[in-house]
Amino acid sequence: ENRALEVTYLYGASGTGKTRGIFEKHDRKSICRITDYGGRNGVRFDAYHCQDVLVLEEFHSQIPISAMLNYLDIYPLTLPARYTDRTACYTKVYITSNIPLEEQYRDIQRYQMETWRAFLRRVQNVIEYLPDGSTVQHKKGGFPCDTK
């Protein structure tokens, strides 16, 4: 069965409250934080146990774009883990970073424009965390090659 998936990109300087905001919005037990990008396809889902919220922390294009497109897709998916792969059950994904969305996957933007567009289509919300603790919701279409 397909999942209704909401993907939110949060960015801003360290200490501005990106992760704190996620934990204030969701029950801790429903959150899986991914912080290790050393596995096959750039990530290991060893800590994932069907949580509803997936957080990709400190993201800087570590996951190959082909894998990332699958992780952010609505279709049924098996996630790579060390001993036993996991079934994706999450319906919310947060990608946190210190850099704006348009600075991710620079080579993909340059040489694989359709792939970059596919990535942008999967991101519904872009929120910037400012040093004063406030946030700015950016409109879709505010990024290069994003026409929506």
Per-range role (PLM):
Residues 1-44, 49, 127-128:
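P-loop NTPase catalytic core of nucleic-acid-dependent motor ATPases
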Residues 35-54, 62, 66-67, 80-85:
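Conserved alpha-helical scaffold flanking the Walker A/P-loop in AAA+ ATPase domains
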Residues 9, 53-55, 94:
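Structural motif
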Residues 58:
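Catalytic glutamate of the conserved HExxH
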Residues 5, 51, 90-92:
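Short, surface-exposed beta-edge/turn micro-motifs
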